[in-house]
Amino acid sequence: MKKYIHYLTIAIITLLFTGCTESDDEFFATKAVTVNNKIEVSASGNVLNVSCNFDRILNYGSDAPLDLFLTTTSRSFFFNYSMQKRNTSGNWENYVPTTLTATKGDNFVGSYISGIQQLDALDTTYEYDTDITLSPGQYRVVVEPRIVSLDSQDVVTVTINTTT
């Protein structure tokens, strides 16, 4: 009898996990589009500027443009980037800036920086603009070329694949 219960337990557990996969698309609606040149990085003197602005109505090469707010109900999107500084031995090491000034959008700073684009007051444009004041030295910026909607609850999450 114990052997029968043991086999029955294994069979039930197997049936429960048969339908589980690692694909989020089965559980959450996602939409991925590609639009180039949405993240801009520029330097002037000791100030590095990172910006990312795009219209709420996104033309991405399809016949019908995508209304990001109606699709996601999200007032914010984000992308991640990190910085590295060359040390005295010539090696690149991770650098976390301490002087960030966001004129549009917001930042979340950890081991990398999350640039958060926010929908403007007129609900027409998602905006992000940040200046980073740097001390003398050589720097490089590594940008993850993916912009993702934040807080898309019970609706579609949109991912914008882009270039810098």
Predicted regions and their residues:
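Sec-dependent signal peptide recognition
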Residues: 3-10
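Bacterial signal peptide processing site
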Residues: 21-23
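Glycine-rich, aromatic-bearing surface loops/beta-hairpins
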Residues: 126-130, 138-164
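Short edge beta-strand/loop segments characteristic of extracellular beta-sandwich folds
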Residues: 51-55
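Structured domain cores in non-transmembrane regions
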Residues: 58-138, 145
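Short beta-strand segments of immunoglobulin-like
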Residues: 36-43
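C-terminal motif of bacterial Sec signal peptides marking the signal peptidase cleavage site
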Residues: 16-19
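Structural beta-strand segments of beta-rich domains
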Residues: 46-50
